[in-house]
Amino acid sequence: PECDSLNLAQWEDYPVGNILFEDKVPESQGSKIYKRIIDNPQNYIKEQAHTVLATLYNSKQDSIAPVYNLHYTLENVEGVSAKGGENGNIYIYYSTQHIERSFANNDTTKLFFETRGVLLHELTHAYQLEPQGIGDYMSSEVFRAFIEGMADAVRAANNGFTPSDRPKGGSY
């Protein structure tokens, strides 16, 4: 379910880890566009991390995957975004090429919606628990289905998708 303001309020002081924002391509159009919609990346990432935590967990006493360091980068790469790292040291990149594609019609609202949705998805990977005893992300479709399904569910629960955003059929 979507996190409500009461549940979200209990997470405001929860430590989400040391957030390091790095723009690896400040000269790119995608970077310039990003900076127009997100003026304080560290605070924005922290706010969205609290939303993810409030959606994934009932309380701060739950068994929560710790995040000590979160290195978030803007990079000139194909694709959209990805999370890597382990043991509380997490990195997430966001593609400036994707930012440019998402802003193709100069629609700031659409871009902000997409940027938030992508961030909710990737932050879910940072804070979610992983299934045990069924392999890993690369070797198990069941593992991937759990991980990606949960991230999409958190995004959807927080109004991060429109009905037309998800292709029908296929496998993810």
Task: Name each model-derived stretch.
Residues 1-2, 9, 171-172:
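Pan-zinc metallopeptidase signature
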